[in-house]
Structures are given as structure tokens and as C-alpha cells.
């Protein structure tokens, strides 16, 4: 269909193919009064392939529906313009909708894609305008692939057990599109920043002014009136935009591999006992001094997991600022949990637990960290079996619980562990702690009835200091 200047007025077109496109719509078309296009690919082809300019000047716009198995339900290929259009694509293992070419739309255009095991909507080009909704059962709702540029659009990605929204390459969003992004999953990851993801946010400014010629003189129309033009500029944001990811049973936000962010605060949360607000893995680079990470959980969930992660706060370091990650939990869960081997130089981790939970649980190998945990009645910092802490400062405070607890076989190197409490125990060693002579363990109780330090296990090498008001110092 297309290839020249044609008009489709209230037409209904259907097509079926195996490995090709059920229908190919291209060229310049005027599509009026609810024109309907439906395409089906029974093999590896695309249901409908769209390229060119499809404009509506009367009545409802075009409705394009494409269905495919391993191909694309609807594929936008090449530079395409749509007005008042509806794109609806479905696929099994392919893409419901694949925006492979630059797509410019108006705000009334809607793009909807669903895939069983594939990707609901895949975006690997420039998108301006449109409301985009992608969903998948076991795959990805919306994928922002390499070279995706999103401007003045609304993105909504959801998945049952996969990723709601996945970023897999270098992606730029304007601040309005980023603020409206919705990423959610039931048991998978709400927002995933995968290997090689590089996300930056731009602010767009439009100014209408009188048009000038090459000599700086006003350009006049046929009636002698000054012509105007709109000048668009873009620049990195100076105030970060919050990207939110939610998951009921999985991770609200997860990073893996090499990831870089600028102009963004990653905000992940979970409400399920088995869920995680934010999971940080791989190499995460904070490229400016305004981006950040916040995490939250309720019940028995975990707000933040740092698992085999190296966090590089280059932008903050260059500005002489501290990079702080805040995580909180309300209930019996954990605010911050470390696993694997993590390098946290120039990073401050703050965990807060209310309702009897644990603020920080240290596991695996942690180096270069500055960690603070606060709990009302639970454990502020727990050092678990097999943990190794190197070149780090760890502080815990619990009002009526335990400020610091070493509960397994752990090791310290050039590190200080301290715990404070009001009426509970400042520091408790119930496991086996091995340390070098430069490491210290201190505990303090500031009110009557509190205990500074209790040792029910063993401490080798470290200096142990306790202080209490009326209870036992050690």
C-alpha cells in the first residue's frame, strides 16, 4: 500500500503472509475516517510494516493491527510520521511493536504492543510524541535499545515475570518523558539497566522568535508581517529526574554489567516479603554529581542489595562531594544487604529500619565502604558468616536492639566496626572475628540498662572497646 500520494477514506485492508509482511504501508498517505489495516504473519515475517507519512485530515485516524509469531507484529521501518493513529501489535516470541526507524507522532497517537515471551515494544530509534504501552508475559514490556531517543512521549512497560522496562544501550530521554516513565513487574524486574546501558536526561527548551535572514533583517511574509520560527535547544538537566521501578515479588530496579547514569535518581521499591527494591550489580558509574539511588521495602522485603558491584561515583568525586545511597525498610525486613565481592570506594551507604528490622546486613567481601545503619528495635548492622570487610568504616545504632552484631566467621582488615544503643547492646560478637591489629570493634550504651560489648564468640587481632552508663561495658 502506498508508494505515492494516495488517500484511504474509511477503508479496511487485510493481508496475510508467511515470512514476508502481511501488509506493507509506505510512502505518503492520507488516511481518513477510521481506516483500518490488519496484517498477519504466520511464519517469521511481520504482520504490518510501516514507513512514510500517514496523515489524517478528516475524522478518526488510521488503526493498524499486526500479529506475528517470531517476527514483529508491527514494524516501523525508516523515517515515519503518524497523526491520530493507533498501532497495536502482538507477537509470540518476537516484538509486538518494533520501532526500528525514527517515528514522529502527535500526542493523540497510541502505540500498544504485547508479546508472550518476546518484547511488547522495542524502541531502537528516535520517538517523538505518542503514548506507548508495552507488556509481556515472560519477556520484556518495553525495551529501550541502543540509540533510542525519547522526546515528549509517555512510556509504560509491564511484565508478569520478566522486565517491565529494560535499557540495553545508549539511551537519551527528555525530562518530561523520563518523569512519566512507568516500569513494573509482578515477579521479575520493574526497571532493568542491562550491560552497556548508558542513560542520560536532557531538558528541552523551545523559544518562538522573529525569523531573520543572513544579514540579520526580519523575514516578512506576503502581507508584510514578520515571520516567526521556533528554536529548540537541549542541555543536560541540572535537577535529576526520578526513574521509578516497582516489583511485587522481584526487584524494583536492577543494574547488571557496565551501566552509566546521568541526570537520574533510580528509585526502586517492593511491597512483598520476597521482593527487593533495588539490586545493584556489575559496574555502575555515576557520571555527574546530581544522580543517585534510593530504595525502599516494607514487611520482610529487602530495600537494597549490593551484589558483586563496583560503584564509581566519578561525578561526585570530581566535585568533591560524597555519593550517598539511602535505603529504608519498615517491618522485619532488611534495608541494605551486601553479597559477593563489592568495591564501594567513595560511596556512603545509609540504611534505616523501623519496626524491628535490620538496617544493614554485611555478607561477602566489602571494600572501601562507609556504611551506617540505624534501627529502632532491631539490629542496626549484622556481619554474617563469611563476610570480609576491608578498608571500611561501619557504624550501627539501635535504640533498644543491637547496634552491631557479628554472627558468623568474619574478617576485618584496616576497618572499624562500631555499634551504639540506648538500652540494648552496643556491639555483640557471637561468631568468630579475625582481624589485623589496625582494626577496631567498639560498643557503647548511653542509657541505664544498656550493655557496651558482649563477646560470646571469639575475637582475634582487633582492639575491642566497650562503654556503658550503668550496665556492663564489656
Write out the residue ranges for each language-model feature.
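Beta-strand-rich solenoid/repeat architectures in extracellular/passenger domains
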Residues: 4-20, 27-45, 52-70, 78-94, ...
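Serine/threonine-rich low-complexity intrinsically disordered regions
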Residues: 202-219, 224-240, 468
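Long, compositionally biased, intrinsically disordered segments
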Residues: 31, 193-196, 201
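N-acyltransferase acceptor-side catalytic subdomain
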Residues: 24, 166, 254
